[in-house]
């Protein structure tokens, strides 16, 4: 699973997800992409599950780029622990996704295969998504 090698601070505040994605909102590598239409936290396990779903569908054809990285630590307290006594220890890693962010890119396959692969991947993700392609001018 994806996670940073090392971080400056072990714990982060929750933060707010306002506005649209300023960076990473256009296709950079592939011909087709999966773009977020909602904001949310995408867990490292969900990123991997979506990648596996796409890879299995396209078999050995094409290339996939993951355009998000989970760099925000989520903390949790042990079960049956009373409130207080400080913040819990880091438990998992998430990527903060805003509307417009390109999550995955793909090339080397037909549009029908890419569309279906991204549909399978989108079912694994907690945010709404849409299919975009380079030739259609990013609208689909």
UniProtKB/Swiss-Prot annotation:
A GO term for molecular function: tRNA binding
Biological processes per GO annotation: translation
Pfam families in the record: Ribosomal_L16
Provenance organism: Geobacter metallireducens (strain ATCC 53774 / DSM 7210 / GS-15)
Family: Belongs to the universal ribosomal protein uL16 family.
Protein name: Large ribosomal subunit protein uL16
Described function: Binds 23S rRNA and is also seen to make contacts with the A and possibly P site tRNAs.
GO cellular component term, pick one: cytosolic large ribosomal subunit
Keywords, sorted A to Z: Ribonucleoprotein, Ribosomal protein, RNA-binding, rRNA-binding, tRNA-binding
UniProt feature coiled coil, ranges: none
CDD domains: Ribosomal_L16_L10e
Intrachain S-S bonds: none
Keyword Heme: no
Stored InterPro entries: Ribosomal_uL16, Ribosomal_uL16_bact-type, Ribosomal_uL16_CS, Ribosomal_uL16_dom, Ribosomal_uL16_sf
Subunit: Part of the 50S ribosomal subunit.
């Amino acid at each position: 699973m994806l996670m940073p090698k090392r971080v400056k601070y072990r714990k982060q505040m929750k933060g707010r997800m306002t506005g649209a994605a300023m960076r990473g909102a256009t296709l950079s590598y592939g011909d087709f992409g999966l773009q977020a239409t909602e904001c949310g936290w995408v867990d490292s396990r969900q990123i991997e599950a979506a990648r596996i779903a796409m890879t299995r569908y396209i078999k050995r054809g094409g290339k996939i780029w993951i355009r998000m990285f989970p760099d925000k630590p989520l903390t949790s307290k042990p079960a049956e622990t009373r409130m207080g006594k400080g913040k819990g220890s880091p438990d998992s890693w998430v990527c903060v996704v805003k509307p417009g962010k390109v999550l995955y890119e793909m090339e080397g396959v037909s549009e029908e295969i890419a569309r279906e692969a991204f549909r399978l991947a989108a079912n694994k993700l907690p945010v709404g998504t849409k299919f975009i392609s380079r030739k259609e001018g990013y609208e689909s």
